[in-house]
Amino acid sequence: MKAAALRLGHASVAKRSISLVRPVAATVVPAQMAQKPDAEPIFGQEDNSDIQDAQFRVLGQPPTLCSVHVPASVSLHVRRGCLVSLHGVGEQNAVAISQEWIGLAWNLAKHGSWRAALFHQLVAPRAFSALVAPNVNGGKIASWFGVSAQQFRTLCLLDLDGTQDWCVLGKHSLIAYEGNTSLRIQRSSVWPSWLHFNRGDSALPSTYQLIQGRGNALLSGAGSVYTIELPNENEELILKGEHLLAISGRTPRDIAEAVTEYSFPAVSVPAIPETAVSKGRTPMPTSSLSAFSTALASYSRNAVSWLRHAYTSYINGTTKYLRIRGPRFLLVQSAHNAFMPATSPSAVQPPSSPVSVKAPASTPNSKDYLSYVTVGKDASVSFQSTPDFNKKVAEIEALKHK
């Protein structure tokens, strides 16, 4: 009996085994050849040693970089801070870099800054290549006055053949251009835009640069830049002034006459009627020193607000829509590079005297708004007002006990 029990106990015991295996070190087989990225060469693969004219090529989608091939003894003008790289230079081909101020007084008067006037002039005895990017930004003080700070910008290339003149607007618009004798850059008058005696009735902003002749000019726009063509003089376009980057025309006069200000029809709003002024509590008398402090603080705030508005209007011009007539080409930027007011001018005229609404004689009681609905057997509905529901609830309870 005991033997049978022992055999049964041994049969119910299960065996488990655990084996430990040492990991084998993995080996990585190195690549036999270097990996080639699927990208277009920035400077190209062609030989540029014999080129006669400067060649500009924008790169990327959207274009944020420009490759420039400069022939021997031809200068390249690049705005300060926008030069990214040089290629094809060395001991045998040293590039001479010098600073050049272009329209310093004009930029100080129009934009209140010297940054847009400082360019680098590059020239070498042999051909070389350069990379240019729109690395422009504004200062913190300028942004407080309404001039935009750093934002996303893209490049746009102008290839002038001498048949069209271009008016380029904006503080950060001109990034680079080739220095040949046939390309000319002029600037508008230093007078503000609200003085029209020097420009007739044109609504073209007074902060433009006129590019004429033959050659290449690299522009920069806020956001993305698009081209709009107005094929004939019957074509017109209404465009917000802050989004206009450049406009073409046969002559400067043709450009100025094609731009007029557009005003939307004003919506007539009835004037607010004046009501009698109700006399409330008599204000507590204040000391003369407290009254003087309050008045001085109010006048100071008004003076700062007026100065800021005047400076912003002088720098950016008034926010307005432009009616542009063809035939011509337009360069439009998707984002604006100027201060935008929070609200548009209202057509409502303020009253001549302060307005105050007389308080009602009595406040309506909430009991006057209580009502109950009775639905009859013939589907008729009747509404009745009641000061409270106590009486009606008692009637309903009495009907239930019947």
From Swiss-Prot:
Region (Disordered): 343-365
GO cellular component assignments: mitochondrial inner membrane
Keyword annotations from UniProtKB, A to Z: Mitochondrion, Transit peptide
Compositional bias (Low complexity): 343-364
Span of chain positions assigned to the transit peptide in the UniProt entry: 1-25
Subcellular location, record wording: Mitochondrion
Entry's Gene Ontology BP terms: inner mitochondrial membrane organization
Gene3D superfamilies: Mitochondrial biogenesis AIM24 (3.60.160.10)
InterPro entries (alphabetical): AIM24, AIM24_sf, Trp_RNA-bd_attenuator-like_dom
Primary localization class, coarse: mitochondrion
The organism's place on the tree of life at top rank: Eukaryota
Family membership: Belongs to the AIM24 family.
Protein name, entry field: Altered inheritance of mitochondria protein 24, mitochondrial
